[in-house]
């Protein structure tokens, strides 16, 4: 009777991306890749190319590099956290499936380790199954869909194709909501409660939402469920959207404008939670924690506190484990045990 090798299964844990180092040249390379994706910028290609190369890439990288440098440790926060999340899931999951040749790898849509390089490695070592877990709790064509595109471009070039599972999102998963609630409760036990809790999500252009991108609605549902579980009244909290880019209208309300309005209207203390980010990064550590704090305090507020992203919290790792284990259990049965 032939002895079959263990079925190879790879889990790809994917986040958006980051420059290699906080320098203008590295940021330029990153922005060039990121902003050249038509999922991100839906402007006619030739027109956008002129804008990108004439007005964005010559000037923006230096300013953005300075912002990255202000939050950079030994590496980019996003990459450090992604690697730590991956290592933790390896410890939790690989020994649980001895019948599978299971690997868990980190990937970035833009920058390194790039998802294209991960897929190239998989082609060199054909897999029975690949599970892609984008670390975007709320699906958007601007964030999650480019990972679908990477697979769509890779598949026609392969002869030995794996089974493929993509976990689209988890914006209302009860373990996700509880993880956010626990992070707020833990923070407030130490720092007290503010007048307002603001749940700030990365924004998208309003025309994208008008064309059917479900992201903003999913953000609102995440925020509603968190507020409900915290027992907040409508006066206790609000939702907003940050990080707008360019001159077109984005989904509203805008985080910076809401904060200054609150301060002008006598709101003195605010805490910020950003449930769109699975790892702290430039948009949370620099934009939310530094820039928006300055805006609020200069407008008359007296207390502004940022509640960290879920990062490698026990509750977050439990969420990721559960998201993956449901699929791994099925694969373990269908791939490993059917071979015996």
Swiss-Prot record:
Main location: cytoplasm
Pfam (any one): Ferrochelatase
Keyword Iron: yes
Binding site for Fe cation: 202, 283
Domain of life: Bacteria
Catalytic reactions on record: heme b + 2 H(+) = protoporphyrin IX + Fe(2+)
Enzyme class: lyase
Keywords recorded for this protein, A-Z: Cytoplasm, Heme biosynthesis, Iron, Lyase, Metal-binding, Porphyrin biosynthesis
GO biological process: heme biosynthetic process
A GO MF term: ferrochelatase activity
Family: Belongs to the ferrochelatase family.
PANTHER family: FERROCHELATASE, FERROCHELATASE, MITOCHONDRIAL
Protein task: Catalyzes the ferrous insertion into protoporphyrin IX.
Protein name, entry field: Ferrochelatase
Organism the protein comes from: Acinetobacter baylyi (strain ATCC 33305 / BD413 / ADP1)
């Amino acid at each position: 009777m032939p002895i079959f090798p263990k079925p190879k299964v790879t889990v790809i844990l994917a986040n958006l991306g980051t420059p290699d180092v906080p320098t203008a040249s590295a940021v330029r390379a990153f922005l060039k890749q990121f902003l050249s994706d038509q999922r991100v910028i839906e402007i006619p290609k030739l027109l956008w190319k002129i804008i990108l190369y004439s007005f964005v890439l010559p000037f923006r990288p230096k300013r953005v590099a300075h912002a990255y440098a202000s939050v950079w440790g030994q590496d980019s926060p996003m990459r450090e956290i992604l690697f730590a999340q991956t290592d933790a899931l390896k410890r939790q999951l690989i020994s649980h499936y001895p019948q599978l040749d299971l690997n868990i790898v980190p990937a970035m849509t833009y920058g390194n380790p790039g998802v294209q390089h991960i897929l190239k490695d998989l082609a060199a070592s054909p897999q029975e199954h690949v599970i892609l877990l984008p670390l975007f709790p709320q699906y958007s064509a601007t964030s999650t869909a480019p990972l679908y595109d990477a697979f769509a471009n890779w598949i026609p070039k392969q002869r030995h194709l794996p089974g493929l599972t993509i976990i689209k999102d988890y914006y209302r998963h009860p373990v996700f909501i509880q993880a956010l609630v626990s992070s707020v409760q833990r923070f407030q036990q130490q720092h007290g409660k503010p007048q307002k809790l603001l749940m700030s999500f990365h924004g998208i252009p309003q025309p994208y939402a008008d064309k059917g991108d479900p992201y903003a609605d999913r953000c609102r549902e995440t925020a509603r469920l968190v507020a409900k579980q915290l027992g907040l009244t409508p006066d206790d909290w609000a939702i907003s959207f940050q990080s707008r880019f360019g001159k077109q209208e984005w989904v509203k309300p805008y985080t910076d404008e809401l904060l200054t309005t609150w301060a002008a209207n006598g709101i003195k203390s605010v805490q910020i939670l950003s449930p769109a980010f699975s790892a702290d990064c430039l948009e949370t550590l620099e934009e939310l924690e530094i820039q928006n704090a300055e805006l609020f305090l200069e407008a008359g507020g007296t207390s502004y506190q940022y509640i960290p992203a879920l990062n490698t919290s026990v509750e977050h790792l439990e969420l990721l484990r559960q998201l993956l284990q449901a699929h791994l259990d099925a694969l373990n049965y269908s791939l490993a045990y059917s071979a015996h």
